[in-house]
Amino acid sequence: MAISKVWISLLLALAVVLSAPAARAEEAAAAEEAAAPEAVLTLHADNFDDAIGQHPFILVEFYAPWCGHCKSLAPEYEKAAQLLSKHDPAIVLAKVDANDEKNKPLAGKYEVQGFPTLKIFRNGGKSIQEYKGPREAEGIVEYLKKQVGPASKEIKAPEDATYLEDGKIHIVGVFTEFSGPEFTNFLEVAEKLRSYYDFGHTVHANHLPRGDAAVERPVVRLFKPFDELVVDSKDFDVSALEKFIDASSTPKVVIFDKNPDNHPYLLKFFQSNAPKAMLFLNFSTGPFESFKSAYYGAVEEFSGKDVKFLIGDIESSQGAFQYFGLKVDQAPLILIQDGDSKKFLKEHVEAGQIVAWLKDYFDGKLTPFRKSEPIPEANNEPVKVVVADNVHDVVFKSGKNVLIEFYAPWCGHCKKLAPILDEAAATLQSEEDVVIAKMDATENDVPGEFDVQGYPTLYFVTPSGKKVSYEGGRTADEIVDYIRKNKETAGQAAAATEKAAEPAATEPLKDEL
């Protein structure tokens, strides 16, 4: 299970003291910028397709007027649009109010799950990619300039390959000629992954700074600043090539410390859906070397397993401790989060126990643990408190229509929403088939049925199990109106449940080959 974007940000933010923000622009420049006409195109349902068709490359932000992150992005987005309007060719930035009723079909079509969502449209919308770049103007500009050019650049001379030694990950295809299925597949993968890596291609392996110059071609060569430094693959199947790049571009053991050079690998580690094994201990104490040796040995022993490994310093990993519900006095500890969001913990682990404990995990012998606050003894407020240990009972098994908020205590938007939810819940208190609930997502594991990428996140769940991300208004009246319009009665819930069960009851048995 991948960790939500907001938590990944916190994990990394707590690992290093962030530098002070850049100096502000002078007032005269700011005034001049404010007076300039808006460079960001405003799109809506009536002009969206035409705009996408007119521009070979366009970045579109799907936003909501009430979204705090959208408001923070707006001036940076506009500044980037103004700077990129001078680029040759011009790079276009646009925005869509996805909260507007007439634009909601667009949000649905392009799978907008939260705000802001940014997508790159190429070639009239034939290619659509998530924007994975920075959120400040200068970063947006540099990122998009790279995205506009070819996905892979030809290396014609040794001087063209000097960038391969810059300490980043690069992928180079070595071919006898720039044609054929292998080259086509390579370019397809380069286009798909260009947001993450730099790609190059050449017919001269001897131009490259590392690797066998006499290698049989075609071959894909990945350069990296860790482990083997260079690794080759001859499998040009698109799926196999993507897997090769994914597996080779992360260290065998990701290090969680204050070194910012490790943060890109941490980001990729926590975004991965693969099972994750994490050893947390104090890097500055004597036993560290023996633990490190034992852990790296275990990584080699289980190298054939589908699991990613991390070793983290306690001091740098407080965000991870908070996310996983761990305590410093449990260290040294080893934790596994599997692809189904289950977690397995061994606290006070000894170096000599690591291999055996991992073997027990792979053999299915371990019992999962879950982060949960205690179930409230009294729960008499209009908005009901739910925790990980009772969320399924309250939300999915109560037979009621439930609006549930996932929040963080430190979140300003959550604090503003709290009295509004209280008011809405009080208004609906006499309607016994309705519950408004809240869960502190920093103290409880969020069930896998919900995708929580930021705070607050709200879902509406009906008695029949229908689950919808709530993207409606943020006033008490709007929330009440939404619930009353969308709730199921007992009869509707029974009918929906019966209808959902019909295919399973009538579908003939099939033999699976």
From Swiss-Prot:
GO terms for cellular component: endoplasmic reticulum lumen. It comes from the Eukaryota. The record marks G68, H69, G412, H413 as: Contributes to redox potential value. The record marks R474 as: Lowers pKa of C-terminal Cys of second active site. Residues 1-25 form the signal peptide. Disulfide bonds join C67-C70, C411-C414. The keyword Ribonucleoprotein does not apply. Its EC number is 5.3.4.1. The keyword Nuclease does not apply. Residues 491-507 have a biased composition (Low complexity). Residues 491-513 are annotated as: Disordered. NCBIfam families: ER_PDI_fam, pdi_dom. Belongs to the protein disulfide isomerase family. This is Protein disulfide-isomerase. It comes from Hordeum vulgare.
